[in-house]
């Protein structure tokens, strides 16, 4: 499974970004819980989930900053 690209996420709305961030945080928590209870976990899933989470949080922050800049200019 390849890591997702940022351009794939640009089409998402703000609400979709927020829900995906929450979903990824839950998935990471579940993965950590499985690892702590010594269940089978694929280690690469940590990397993929953290990568996606970072991309979404970056996108969310970029949108916040552009919104602030437009409100300051007006």
Curated annotation (Swiss-Prot):
Matches recorded under PANTHER family: 60S RIBOSOMAL PROTEIN L35/50S RIBOSOMAL PROTEIN L29, LARGE RIBOSOMAL SUBUNIT PROTEIN UL29C
One GO-annotated biological process of the protein: translation
GO molecular function: structural constituent of ribosome
Keyword Cell wall biogenesis/degradation on entry: no
GO annotation, cellular component aspect: cytosolic large ribosomal subunit
Keywords, comma-separated and alphabetical: Ribonucleoprotein, Ribosomal protein
Name of protein: Large ribosomal subunit protein uL29
NCBIfam families referenced in this protein's UniProt entry, alphabetically: L29 (TIGR00012)
Top-level taxon of the source organism: Bacteria
One Pfam family per UniProt: Ribosomal_L29
Protein family according to the UniProt entry: Belongs to the universal ribosomal protein uL29 family.
